[in-house]
Amino acid sequence: RKIAVKCAYENCFISINKIIYIESYQRKRIIYTKEQVYETGASLNDLLSLLPVEQFEMPQKSYIVNFDHVTSITKTKVILDYSTEIKLARDRMTNFNMKFQKYIRG
């Protein structure tokens, strides 16, 4: 399954399972995959609404992560493939951990 997002002057079709994480930086959202990095003006909430709710979550207000690419979770951060570390907000920690546990149990 893919999502369509407006990237620069064209529509990009991105495979959902290839998305590692999405970052909100300044006035754009950056979608990271293994092969490529995409930039879009869509909001994080708009992007989150296109993604499977059980597979994606926000560890803090500026990021969305794909549970398929989480390698570990500490009290303060989420570690993804390629040793990418994203801070885990204290007020989101419990919900994030519960949702991740539910996801890996299937």
Residue ranges and their predicted role:
Residues 1-87:
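Conserved binding/recognition cores within well-folded domains
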